[in-house]
A protein has these predicted regions:
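Active-site-proximal loop/turn and secondary-structure-junction residues that shape catalytic pockets
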Residues: 70, 127, 239-242, 250, ...
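Active-site loops and adjacent core secondary-structure elements that bind or stabilize anionic groups
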Residues: 1-201, 216-234
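Glycine- and Gly-Pro-enriched alpha-helical subdomains that act as flexible
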Residues: 72-113, 244-343
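Gly-rich Lys/Arg/Thr-decorated short loops/hinges at beta-loop-alpha junctions or inter-strand turns
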Residues: 23-35, 111-117, 193-210, 288-309, ...
Length: 394
């Protein structure tokens, strides 16, 4: 297949639309089910590169959950804990025996479930039945992978009455070294972003604390790979091989840090006994529970706890999760890694990151205030690596 006609472009009025190879060669994909759209393919091709890089850097299967050309979550395939199984809504499945790929998607989808609603999924490895069954129960637009087992494909083809988008990509495909895009009729050309994220990139530790565990090195690489395919400006918090907060597309660096930090905080607050024991009605769906939890742990909690409202969601009225209780719980969050796609211009980013348990940071460096940023890291005993490489993505 040399080209594929699409229903429309970014919006329904943008017609005609298609994807094709400029050199006339075959497309590196096959559509096995559904009719993927323009934005679906943007998510699919960006997400595929991300999981391919994660697999190469860590040796583990990887998954990502994309929305609007940025990852809402991404992870490598480490086993789930009982608490994670609960907050990712898979405790009713055989999660203890999930394949590594299924664990990766459970983590990628579970990190920020509000943002992942209606995601496009990318998988580094052949999709197995475990992963397909997990995908089947979520609201999702589609999936791309290098292959599918017969059982997995049968499961996925049942989704959306047979209209779920399933794409197979050639894992051996390598794009040309130069890439092009047009804006306002003008063609832009640049070298493809082929930077390898490896141990050498994070070897320049500029803080007093120079101790990096193997897990910290892994999480630094995971954060930088995620940022490589996230709309800039971007910041990513990572713990145990998975993104727990991605701040994408912000014009201000500190707003990235705050946005991603709040998402990371929400991820950890969802693990608190107060949230785990919320008395949901049995009829409340997973998506409705996600929405209710998001409001409950936020500043507008009375929207879900007010008389006349709580009865719609809970069997009994939950107690308020006070600001003091939340802070006490968040103070237990430790060993978080923070990656940034460009330098921190002010030390306020470090102050905010520390509140979310950040112990390790990877960023390019190069600010006129690098010394202030380093001093603030030293104040909190944070280990920080300067990569010397910016990772903007537009």
């Amino acid at each position: 297949m040399k080209e594929l006609e699409l229903k429309y472009g970014c919006n329904p009025n943008q017609k005609p639309s298609k994807i094709y190879m400029e050199d006339g060669s075959e497309l590196p994909i096959k559509v096995l089910s559904g009719k993927p759209g323009y934005i679906n393919f943007l998510d699919a091709f960006n997400g595929w590169q991300l999981v391919r890089d994660l697999k190469k850097a860590t040796g583990l299967p990887a998954a990502t959950s994309f929305k609007h050309v940025s990852p809402a979550g991404a992870s490598i395939g480490l086993p789930l804990t009982e608490t994670l199984a609960k907050i990712y809504w898979v405790e009713d499945m055989d999660w203890q025996n999930f394949s590594p790929l299924a664990c990766a998607y459970a983590r990628a989808r579970g990190a920020d479930r509000m943002s992942s609603f209606g995601d496009f999924i990318s998988l580094s490895d052949v999709c197995d039945k475990d992963t397909a069954l997990l995908i089947k129960r979520e609201v999702s637009d589609g999936v791309i992978a290098p292959g599918y087992t017969e059982e997995a494909l049968e499961v996925l083809k049942q989704k959306k009455k047979g209209n779920y988008n399933v794409i197979q990509i050639d894992p051996e495909y390598v794009p040309a070294p130069l890439e092009h895009k047009q804006v306002f009729g003008v063609t832009f050309e640049q070298g493809r972003q082929a930077l390898a994220i490896d141990d050498e990139l994070i070897s320049n530790i500029v803080t007093e604390n120079k101790e990096l565990s193997e897990e910290a090195k892994r999480d630094m690489k995971v954060s930088l790979i995620i940022l490589k395919y996230t709309q800039s400006n971007s910041v990513c918090y990572v713990k145990d091989g998975q993104a727990i907060g991605v701040g994408a597309g912000q014009q201000s660096r500190v707003h990235c840090t705050r946005l991603a930090g709040q998402k990371a905080d929400n991820w950890f607050l969802r693990q608190s006994p107060k949230v785990l024991n919320l008395p949901f009605k049995e009829s409340i769906s997973r998506a409705e529970r996600d929405n209710a939890i998001d409001v409950y742990i936020g500043d507008e909690y009375m929207d879900v706890l007010a008389d006349g409202n709580w009865e719609k969601t809970f069997t009994e009225k939950p107690a308020v999760f006070t600001k003091e209780e939340k802070r006490a719980w968040l103070d237990q969050m430790t060993d978080v890694t923070l990656g940034s796609d460009a330098f921190f211009p002010f030390s306020d980013n470090i102050e905010r990151a520390y509140k979310s348990g950040v112990k390790y940071i990877a960023q390019p460096g190069g600010s006129v205030r690098d010394a202030d940023v380093i001093d603030t890291c030293n104040k909190y005993n944070i280990a920080m690596a300067f990569t010397g490489i910016r990772l903007f993505h537009h």
